[in-house]
Amino acid sequence: LVDTAGKLISYFNSPYYTKTISVEHVEQDPNDWFKLILKGLTEFKNKNPSCQLSALSMCSQVNTHVFLDERGEALLPAIFWQDTRAKVEANEIDSKISNEQKISWWGTPMPIDASHVISRMLWVKKNKPDVWAKTKYVMLPKDYCIFKLSGEVVSDPLSNIGLVDNNLKYIDDLLSLVSGAPAKLPPLKKMTEQVGVIKKELPFNGTKIINGTMDAWIGILGSGGFENKKNIYLSGTSEILGINSKEVMPTPGIIIFPEDENIKLHAGPTQ
C-alpha cells in the first residue's frame, strides 16, 4: 500500500503452497491466491480505516495457467510454470513452426516449450477431453484474481509473451494449431488501462482495478529498465538480465518483448 507520492504505507505478504506431484507435475491452488489477496486487503483496511484507495493493480507470475468453466470455477489445479507435463505437445507444436515465422512474430527464434499455454491447451485436450470441453477460459494468475475481484475477463499483451506478436495482438496462425484455443483466451487490454472495479461485497469495494502485467517485466522496469540501453540484473526465483533497446538481433535464448509504453525489453534467461 503506497500513497500518491510513492511512500510505502503498509505491506502484506504470506507463503502459499506449491504441490510437486512428480518431476513433471507441479501445481498450485488458485483459490490460495485470491484468499490471500482478500486477507491483505482486509488487513490494509483494518490498519488504515480512514484510507481511501484510489486504485489497485495486479502483477503475477506467468506461464502458470488455470482452466475455468463457464461459472469461473477452476476445473484443475493451476499448472505451475515449472510443470513440464506438456513437453511432448510442445515439441509437436514447435515442429510445425519455422524459425522464420518465429522471428517475424517475436524478433527471435523462441521455442515453444512445455510452459507455453498452447502446449498445455493441447495436453488438456488430449489427456482430459472432458475438462477441455467444459473450459470457458484459460487464465494467468493475475487475470484470475482480477476476475474474482471484479467479474471482468481480461489479460494484457506482455503477460502473454510467446502468444502475441510485435503488434501486441494474439497470433492467429499459432492459435490455429490447437482447434478451439482462440475462443478460450481472455481479450487483451493495455497494462495501464482500468479493467474493472472491486465488487461491492469485497474490501475497498468500488476501487478501480488497473490491468498490470507480468512479474519479470515489472521487476526489470522497477530496477531502472525503462532507461534506454541500461543493463539490468534481476535476481530471484529466476535470474534475469535485461536491457531496453530498439535494436533487434535475433539470438537463441533471448526473449524480445513486444514494445509497450515505449519500452522494448530484451531479457534472458528467464527460467
Model-derived regions: residue spans:
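Glycine-rich phosphate-binding loop of actin/hexokinase-like ATP-binding domains
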Residues: 65-70, 74-93, 135, 139-170, ...
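Short, intrinsically disordered, charge-balanced linker/junction segments flanking boundaries
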Residues: 3, 195-202, 265-271
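Acidic-glycine-rich active-site phosphate/pyrophosphate-binding loop
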Residues: 10-13, 189-202, 243-255
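Short glycine/serine/threonine-rich phosphate/pyrophosphate-binding segments
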Residues: 60-61, 118, 217-220
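N-terminal glycine/serine-rich phosphate-binding loop of ATP-dependent small-molecule kinases
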Residues: 1-76, 134, 203-211, 249
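Glycine-rich beta-strand-to-loop/alpha-helix junction loops that act as flexible
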Residues: 56-62, 191-193, 235-237
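Gly/Ser/Thr-rich active-site cleft segment
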Residues: 103-216
